[in-house]
From Swiss-Prot:
One GO CC term, this protein: cytoplasm
Protein name per UniProt: Calcium-binding and coiled-coil domain-containing protein 1
GO biological process per UniProt: positive regulation of transcription by RNA polymerase II
Gene (UniProt): calcoco1
Coiled coil start-end: 141-212, 246-346, 424-510
Biased composition (Polar residues): 576-589
InterPro entries: CALCOCO1-like, SKICH, UBA_autophagy_assoc_protein
Compartments in which it is found: Cytoplasm; Nucleus
């Protein structure tokens, strides 16, 4: 079974040429983790150590490589580092950074190419006139490959140039698109700004409506909250009353228990008195028993002393009996006395036995007295314990009674305070409810007013919209009238130029008639002196209206009305102003008065434009009549 490698070599040939580079293809399996210090070595077959490599290259991995994935890679062994042609077999070995062998390739050799392998046969058609004659060319493969490589490089350069041109076109297209996008963004922003303004207005109206709705909802919520609070207060009041009733029942139960405990305490006191009397009796009896015990102990001591004396006397008698036994043989004559003494001894022994029995009885009495004393001491201790427990229970009962009475007093005080606070809270709630009812009424009135104002605002908004529509329509009409006036002004200007040319021709004709001009020359200085002497009249004539001047850059109505006015007689001072040839000869150089008249005429022109449709109609009606009258009057009027 073949060993499974963590790296697999692919497309390994059996023979390579040392004059060209060698490509080593391999696959990194998921079991192997690639590191930057992994390398691939070219080893001779039969190698024993990783240091016996002929040459090596660092193993590479693509930038998108991730651990735990399978990836195909390729490295190049340059021709300068490859071994020469020989029969020695080589193999690729993949070594990781730790020096472990990850894979070995199949064996291959390096051999020089044969001469026939370097030649390539090409078939070319003949360029002559004879058809069917072909040429066979035999060239080296390296030359063929070199020519193909040059063609490929040339194609690559052309493709790169085309790519650069395409990139430039793309950049220009991007710039144009960016400019178009900027213009569109500008228009879009303007439209969005307008839309935002309209949305802002709509939002403001909606916010107003929402505020009104919120206020109304707050008022309704406040009313509901007040009703809920009122219900909660009523429920709390009922709960407090129920609690007060329960506390009263608890107080009754506690008072009854206190009375029962007082009776139990009286009973305990009586029992304590009885136990104290019994204790006194027991103490007296104990004292008597102690006295009796002391007496019996004294008797016992005396009896023991007697017993010791009797024992000593008995010992003496025994010794004497022994002496008598020793001397019984010699003292036979004293036998009777000995028998008497023996009888006396027997009596003494009987007395001793009786004393011993009395001693045993006294000891038994002492034991019984001791047991009784122990029982009495135990009874006394139990009585003391019971008395102590009774005292503790009495103290606890007194404390509980005091606590119950204190709790009863506190409960009554709290109940009174809670009752007062509840009454005060009820009164405050009543006042609050009244205030809130008043506030609700006021807010309802305010809400009605707000609704009325909102309806008025909606109506005013509709009116404003209608006014805006009317203003836009009137603005369109005024624009049209302005265009008509401009066309009419151009026509009047053209007509005035024609009149000026005619007046110049007429003035030349009149100046040629010297005979008729002598009288007019004599009268003209007088008239000019009269103008100098009376400038107010001249100013009045100029300020009387826009009909008595020849300014061409003024209101069109003044130019139209100028020829329509009949020329006054030469005796009037206004004739001097009208018949002056200076404005006609130099119409583009008006005096200060003409400037003032032109400014006034411009103001009147603005007033005429703001006048609307009526002024335009009047101007349109006056134009044909003025033209006809002007032509007739110019034909009849003199030059001066």
């Amino acid at each position: 079974m073949e060993k499974t490698w963590r790296v697999e070599f692919r497309n390994v040939g059996s023979c390579y040429f040392p004059q060209s580079r060698v490509d080593c293809h391999y696959t990194i399996n998921p079991q192997h983790t690639w590191a930057s210090n992994d390398w691939i070595g070219l080893f001779k077959v039969g190698w024993s150590s990783v240091k016996e490599y002929h040459t090596f290259v660092w193993a590479v991995a693509p930038s998108s490589y991730k651990e735990g994935t399978s990836v195909n890679c390729c490295v190049n062994f340059q021709a300068s580092y490859l071994p020469g042609p020989s029969a020695q077999q080589y193999q690729f070995v993949y070594v990781d950074g730790k020096g472990e062998i990850c894979s070995c390739s199949a064996a291959f050799t390096f051999s020089a190419p044969k001469p026939l392998e370097e030649l390539v046969t090409l078939e070319e058609e003949g360029q002559g006139e004879e058809v069917g004659e072909d040429m066979l060319l035999v060239i080296p493969r390296a030359q063929l490959l070199q020519s193909r490589l040059q063609e490929c490089l040339k194609e690559r350069a052309e493709l790169l140039q085309a790519l650069e041109a395409a990139d430039q076109n793309v950049e220009r297209e991007k710039g144009r698109r960016e400019r178009d996008r900027g213009s569109w963004e500008h228009t879009r922003k303007e439209l969005e700004r307008k839309i935002d303004d309209l949305k802002e207005e709509v939002r403001e109206y909606r916010e107003k409506v929402e505020d009104m709705k919120k206020k109304q909802k707050e008022v309704e919520d406040l009313g509901e909250a007040l009703t809920e609070e009122k219900r909660a207060l009523l429920a709390q009041k009922e709960a407090n009353e129920q609690r007060i009733r329960e506390l009263e029942e608890d107080i009754k139960i506690l008072t009854q228990r206190g009375l029962e405990r007082e009776t139990d305490l009286e009973r305990m006191r009586e029992r304590a008195k009885k136990s104290a009397a019994q204790k006194r009796e027991d103490e007296d009896e104990h004292k008597n028993l102690k006295l009796k015990m002391e007496q019996t102990e004294k008797e016992l001591h005396s009896l023991s002393a007697e017993f010791q004396s009797l024992r000593s006397s008995l010992a003496q008698r025994d010794t004497h009996a022994l002496q008598l036994r020793d001397t019984i043989t010699t003292l036979t004559h004293k036998l009777n006395s000995a028998h008497r003494k023996e009888a006396a001894n027997e009596l003494a022994l009987n007395e001793l036995r009786s004393v011993q029995e009395r001693l045993n009885v006294s000891e038994h009495c002492v034991e019984t007295l001791r047991g009784e004393l122990r029982d009495m001491v135990a009874q006394r201790d139990s009585a003391h314990a019971e008395l102590h427990q009774a005292r503790l229970q009495a103290a606890q009962l007194t404390l509980q009674l005091a606590d119950a009475s204190l709790a009863l007093r506190e409960g009554r005080a709290n109940w009174a305070q809670e009752r007062e606070t509840l009454q005060q809270n009820a009164e405050i709630d009543k006042v609050r409810l009244e205030r809130q009812n008043d506030e609700i009424q006021q807010k309802e009135e305010m809400l009605q007013k707000a609704r009325m104002e909102r309806e008025k605002a909606v109506v005013e908004l509709g009116r404003e919209k209608d006014c805006n529509r009317e203003l836009k329509a009137s603005l369109r009409v005024a624009q049209k009238e302005k265009e008509q006036l401009q066309t009419e002004i151009q026509e009047v200007m053209e007509y005035s130029r024609q009149l000026e040319r005619r007046l110049e021709v007429l003035s030349d004709c009149k100046w040629s008639e010297t005979a008729l001009l002598q009288s007019s020359r004599a009268e003209s200085p007088l008239l000019s002196d009269s103008e100098d002497e009376n400038p107010e009249a001249l100013q009045d004539t100029h300020s009387s209206g826009p009909l008595n001047h020849y300014s061409l850059c003024e209101q069109p109505q003044s130019d139209l009305l100028l020829p329509a006015t009949p020329p006054p007689s030469p005796r009037h001072p206004s004739t001097v102003v009208i018949s002056q040839p200076a404005p006609l000869s130099s119409p583009h150089q008006p005096s200060a008065r003409s400037h003032t008249h032109s400014s006034e005429s411009e103001e009147e022109y603005e007033a005429a434009l703001s006048g609307g449709h009526s002024s335009g109609e009047e101007t349109a009606l006056l134009l044909p009549d003025n033209r006809d009258t002007t032509l007739g009057e110019l034909a009849e009027s003199p030059l001066w």
